[in-house]
Structure formats: C-alpha cells, structure tokens
C-alpha cells in the first residue's frame, strides 16, 4: 500500500488529453497557455501553464490528483475561465512533465503549492486575488497547505473528494481487502514514517483545517467508492470558520463534474459568486 501511494502508476499528459471529455468543455483546449518552470526550494523543477483572462486580477490555481497530470484539472478550468478567472495548472511533484520522484500524498506537495502561489503573485502582481480548487489528492494537498495560509492569502477553496488522512484512507483499503483494520492501520502508519519519512499528521487535511480561517466549499460524490464520502464529513466537522458542503447523489470519485454536470456547475458558480 505504501509503495502504491508513494510510487503511483502515472498517466501521461498525452493520454489524458486524448481521453478527456472534449465535448463537455468545448473551447478549453483552444485557450492560450503560457508554460512555466519553477525551481523549488530543494532544486526540484515544477512544470505548469497559465491561461490569462485579459487583465483579470482573479486567479484560480488548480491541483490534480494522484497519478494524474495538470490535464486532470482541465475539466474545472473552463468553468472558472468563464467567470473571469485566469487559470493556473501545474503537474504535481513526480507527475506529468516533471522528473519522477516519490509522492508524499500532500506532505511535500503542500509546500510546493505555497511556492507556486508565491510565484504567481510575484509574476502577476501582489494585488491579485487567488482561489484554489483541487480534486482527490489535489484537494488534500490544498487543505494540508492551509497550515501555511491565511484568509488574506487566499480568497476561498473548493475541495472535491479529499481524504481526511492517508491513515484513514489506508485503513479503508485494508478493510476493503478483508484484513483487520485495527491491527494493520498502525503498521501502515509505521511503514510510511520509517520507510518513506512521512509522519501521520503531515498527510492529514483533517488535522490542519482545525486552524484554517479560509472559506472552504467541500464537494463529494455519494457513490465515491475510492475515497468514501465520510472523509469530507470528517474534514468539514474539523474545519473552523466559514464552510459549506455539498454531496452529489450520483457522483463517483472525482467525477461529480461529469456525473451531475448541471448541479455541479450550479453549486460551484453560486459559491464563487458569493465569495469573490
């Protein structure tokens, strides 16, 4: 389990572009994208792109999930672009166009996101307004990053189907394979800490939102059988301050935007307009 999480089966950008729901997002792939490379604190280089929306001061940074690429965020980009936002996409550490490396399920990726936020502000102006949207591990990455962020830094967050902690997610995986969860979950946590150098709370959105004052919209599909809906429930309950939650009855994992597109757009657009 630890190996599968830290060394995921990667999808290529080319594969995701080919298999994307082009008919659902007409015109998005025609948007002009300005590529960027960002050298991080440890020398690692992150690849991404920006679709500027005229002179807009509103930016959305999109974070993709485990094993995916920035194309995994494309399905949300056009919705925000139509609302007047410039769109920033990037490949998470070890994914997409980046050099392969260990995935830490949000522990290091959350620090990367902070550097990307700073890069966007330094490039496009300290007066821009940044919001964040993530799905699955992308949502978890954002929520873990809130330990470094305040309401003055980020307008609001849209978190779609995050795990409450990798420990809980690992426990679900163990239970799904009919193994004793109460015995093996501590073993899983030990392996992640000793062999992969990742502490339990470093991979726990539920732990970090306890001090987060940024408004958050939590989304989850009721039919998500990969990251079960209770994960969002736990984070929602732990989060202090302003928060909202919506469950999509027909939504599967990270696919509510396709499983219930009209309702998804209605909920998100309404939230965005109320929090701009």
Question: Residues of each region from the PLM?
Answer:
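Catalytic nucleophile-loop/oxyanion-hole region of alpha/beta-hydrolase
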Residues: 95-128
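An N-terminal hydrophobic leader/cap segment in hydrolases
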Residues: 1-39, 49
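Hydrolase active-site cap/lid region
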Residues: 144-198
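Acidic catalytic loop of the alpha/beta-hydrolase fold
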Residues: 223-227, 254-255
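Conserved alpha/beta-hydrolase
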Residues: 77-99
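Short beta-strand/loop motif that positions the catalytic acidic residue
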Residues: 211-213, 218-220, 224
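Catalytic histidine-centered segment of alpha/beta-hydrolase-like enzymes
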Residues: 251-265
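Short alpha-helix in the alpha/beta-hydrolase fold that links the catalytic acid
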Residues: 76, 214, 228-237
């Amino acid at each position: 389990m630890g190996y599968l999480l830290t060394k995921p089966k990667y999808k290529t950008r080319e594969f995701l572009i080919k298999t994307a729901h082009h008919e659902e997002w007409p015109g998005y792939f025609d948007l002009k994208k300005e590529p960027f490379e960002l050298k991080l604190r440890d020398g690692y280089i992150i690849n991404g792109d920006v679709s500027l929306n005229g002179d807009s001061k509103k930016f959305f940074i999109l974070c993709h999930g485990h094993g995916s690429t920035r194309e995994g965020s494309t399905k949300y980009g056009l919705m925000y672009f139509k609302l007047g936002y410039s769109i920033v996409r990037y490949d998470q550490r070890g994914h997409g166009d980046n050099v392969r490396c260990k995935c830490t399920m949000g522990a290091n990726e959350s620090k990367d996101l902070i550097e990307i936020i700073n890069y966007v502000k330094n490039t496009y102006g300290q007066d821009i307004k940044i919001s964040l949207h993530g799905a699955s591990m992308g949502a978890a990455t954002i929520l873990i990053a809130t330990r470094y962020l305040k309401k003055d830094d980020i307008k609001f967050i849209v978190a779609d189907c995050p795990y409450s902690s990798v420990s809980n997610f690992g426990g679900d995986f163990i239970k799904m394979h009919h193994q004793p969860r109460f015995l093996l979950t501590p073993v899983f946590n030990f392996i992640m800490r000793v062999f992969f150098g990742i502490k339990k709370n470093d991979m726990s959105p539920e732990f970090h939102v306890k001090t987060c004052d940024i408004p958050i919209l939590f989304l989850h599909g009721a039919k998500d059988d990969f990251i079960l809906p209770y994960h969002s429930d736990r984070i929602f309950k732990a989060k202090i301050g302003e928060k909202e939650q919506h469950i999509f009855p027909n939504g599967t994992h990270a696919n509510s935007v396709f499983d219930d597109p009209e309702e998804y757009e209605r909920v998100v657009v309404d939230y965005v307009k109320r929090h701009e």
